Design a protein with these regions (language model features):
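N-terminal secretory signal peptides and thylakoid transit peptides that target proteins
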Residues: 1-14
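C-terminal segment of N-terminal export signals and the immediately downstream linker at the start
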Residues: 17-64
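A short Gly-Trp-Pro
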Residues: 48, 53-56, 62-64, 69-96, ...
Length: 183
């Protein structure tokens, strides 16, 4: 290999590594969005803490949740694509866990993925736990509410910049709380 070619290759490799090491410029915006999520709540709203666990029996969950929400959240089912009214929800506000009311996303975290399910590129910090799901043979990452353990959906690496993440959420696992307080 010629010396000039070797030097060019090394320089390009160094620059590529530096670019990978530096956080994207708009990640600061994500951090601010995550930090300031409470600004999307209606005035005077009380929200549960993720450190207050909700433990109910299967029968208690069955009584508390509508049938489809129970199937998704307690039996790790999936709602039919395109059926959730939350797909078209555009108002400012908070998306909370339908099982326990824990805020999990803001309206600013939502994006149109074209999949038929409400999709988000990031979350309110500390609200979900993840685990591998081998239901469809290949491994996927599913996420559950940290407070009540309810299944919400799956996490994919095909979302928009800067996170590249898509939290594909079942609409029946969420309830929307508009910032203006009007249902």
């Amino acid at each position: 290999m010629e010396r000039r070619t070797l030097l060019k290759t090394l320089a390009l490799a160094f620059l590529a590594r530096q670019a990978d090491a530096a956080p994207p410029a708009n990640m600061k915006g994500i951090e601010e969005l995550q930090k300031n999520w409470k600004t999307f709540l209606p005035a005077g709203a009380n929200v549960p803490s993720p450190t207050e666990p909700v433990k109910l029996s299967k029968d208690e969950w069955r009584k508390k949740l509508p049938a489809e929400s129970f199937h998704v959240m307690r039996e790790e089912g999936t709602e039919r694509a395109g059926t959730s009214p939350l797909n078209s929800e555009k108002r400012a506000g908070i998306f909370a866990c339908a099982g326990c009311g824990l805020p999990v996303f803001t309206s600013e975290m939502k994006f149109e993925s074209g999949t038929g399910w409400p999709s988000f590129f990031t979350t309110i910090p500390g609200v979900f736990e993840t685990k591998k799901d081998y239901y469809l043979i290949y491994p996927r990452v599913e996420y559950h509410c940290i407070r009540c353990g309810g299944h919400h959906g799956h996490l994919f690496d095909d979302g928009p910049a800067p996170t590249g993440k898509r939290y594909c959420n079942n609409g029946v696992a969420l309830r929307f709380i508009p910032k203006d307080g009007k249902a």
